[in-house]
């Protein structure tokens, strides 16, 4: 998305991908005009690298969906975009005569997509008697949201290390601080899924 948008706007983009990323994905992003490298870092370390590198160039901007103190505006915009996908899903459900689903499952890495989906459906179904169960699913190797939910003290948790999983896009060990607030208050269930679950589809 970032490389595509930068290309359309005539801007330069640099993408740091975490180890375990495929050469195919790297090439697809590069085809959008970005400078792309696969680093020997996990996802969260790549975010820190991108943040550092953005400060070394004039007008450098980090475009990232994970938030931390002092970096919330762009992640909020991205989460609003994810909310559009939730709205489109709700419209399709209604078109198929499904007034209220029984369950909504959403994947999570840093939790931005999950926070948007959970927030959207919490609001949409706030006045119905039987609300859907909102279920957040993470890769077991990077289950930071799950660990925060299990701790049950309202604080986010960080998972460190290689975060090795076949669920490459979900190998994130540090939660988005904005979405964590939504998830801890509105998600019904957090699931830590091992790779064999993803293999089964």
Q: Which role fits each region the language model picked out?
A:
Residues 1-53, 145-158, 179:
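Active-site-proximal loop->helix
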Residues 2-9, 114-125, 132:
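Short Gly/Thr/Asp-enriched flexible loops that form oxyanion-binding sites at enzyme active sites
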Residues 6, 29, 89, 104-105, ...:
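Buried hydrophobic positions in well-ordered alpha/beta secondary-structure cores of metabolic enzymes
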Residues 9-13, 32-34, 56-60, 99-102, ...:
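Short coil/turn connectors at secondary-structure junctions
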Residues 10-25, 103, 124-141:
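Short, acidic/small-residue loops that bind anionic groups at enzyme active sites
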Residues 14-18, 39, 63-64, 74-78, ...:
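Glycine- and other small-residue-rich loops at beta-strand/loop junctions that grip anionic moieties
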Residues 44-47, 51, 55, 59, ...:
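Active-site/ligand-binding loops adjacent to catalytic centers
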Residues 57-125, 181-184, 192-201:
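Active-site/ligand-binding-proximal alpha/beta "capping" segment
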């Amino acid at each position: 998305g970032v490389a595509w948008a930068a290309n359309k706007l005539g801007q330069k983009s640099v993408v740091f991908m975490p180890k375990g990323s495929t050469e195919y994905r790297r090439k697809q992003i590069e085809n959008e005009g970005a400078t792309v490298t696969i680093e020997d870092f996990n996802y969260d370390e790549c975010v820190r690298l991108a943040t550092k590198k953005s400060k070394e160039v004039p007008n450098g901007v980090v475009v990232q969906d994970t938030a931390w103190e002092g970096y919330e505006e762009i992640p909020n915009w991205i989460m609003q975009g994810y909310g559009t996908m939730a709205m489109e899903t709700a419209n399709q459900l209604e078109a198929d005569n499904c007034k209220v689903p029984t369950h909504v499952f959403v994947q999570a890495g840093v939790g931005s997509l999950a926070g948007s989906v959970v927030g959207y459906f919490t609001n949409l179904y706030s006045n119905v008697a039987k609300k859907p169960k909102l279920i957040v699913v993470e890769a077991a190797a990077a289950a930071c949201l799950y660990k925060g939910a299990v701790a049950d003290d309202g604080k986010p948790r960080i998972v460190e290390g290689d975060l090795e999983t076949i669920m490459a896009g979900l190998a994130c060990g540090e939660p988005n601080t904005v979405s964590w607030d939504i998830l801890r208050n509105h998600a019904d269930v957090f699931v830590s899924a091992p790779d064999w679950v993803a293999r089964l589809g």
